[in-house]
Amino acid sequence: MELSGNTVLITGGATGIGYALAEAFVEAGSRVIICGRRLNRLEEAKRNHPEIDIIQADAANPSDRARLLKVIVENFPSINILVNNAGIQKDIDFAFGELNFEDIQEEIKINLEAPVILSAMFIPHLKGKKNAAIINVSSGLGFVPAARMPVYSATKAGLHAFSIALRHQLSRVGIKVFEVVPPAVDTELNPEGRAKRANFKIDLKPAEFVAGVMEELKSDVFEIGYGPSKKYIQASRAELDEYFRMMNSRW
């Protein structure tokens, strides 16, 4: 993938990995539009990087998705890269917890439904564009699920499968499909869960992770891991089962 000269839309682009990707694409010489739910964080990103365009939109909301498509097509018709990055993560205990079905549905809508539907909506506008691509941000937990985050793990496993199938289909129309597979990165994801695990320290910063991602994108590596998540991508089923036992031994 060429990193410069693109028009890139990044969902969930105001914070964390999405924001680091936005900074990296701007630095590489691409035009970047970010969308997200929180206007204050979008405006903060805009203050830091005036060249970034911002759109307040909830990727999980059908009417917001339709509006987002309309705004992009009308104002940024050169769009050639869609980054499905928006995501949420929740600790959910199906055995002993008080289940909130709205929380479960929200996690599925944002993490899996949104990237699938947005891909379908934007593909007609990516066809025929130079350097066209869809970049899906999944998770190492899509390969080795965390028992305390069953819905999150399931949505990311679904996004992994979707990325494989979509890559095969879109190879016929010149659109590349990349999957970025983060390990644990120090972001605002799941603050409630992290508060319960104060002794679990995450050292990897979004900018460091994304620097590695950009190098892999440049080399057309279609499944991009980092540290433990790179091992998960390359592991056999027996190895994945062992990683699962190790990760969840105290659950």
Q: What positions do the PLM features span?
A:
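Residue(s) in the substrate-gating loop at a strand-loop-helix junction
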Residues: 139
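The beta1-alpha1 cofactor-binding region of Rossmann-like NAD(H)/NADP(H)-dependent oxidoreductases
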Residues: 57-68
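Active-site helix of classical SDR
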Residues: 119, 155
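Conserved mid-core segment of classical short-chain dehydrogenase/reductases
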Residues: 89-105, 148
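C-terminal helical subdomain
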Residues: 179, 195-232
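Conserved glycine-rich cofactor-binding loop
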Residues: 7, 12-16
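Conserved glycine-rich Rossmann-like NAD(P)H-binding loop of the short-chain dehydrogenase/reductase
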Residues: 28-44
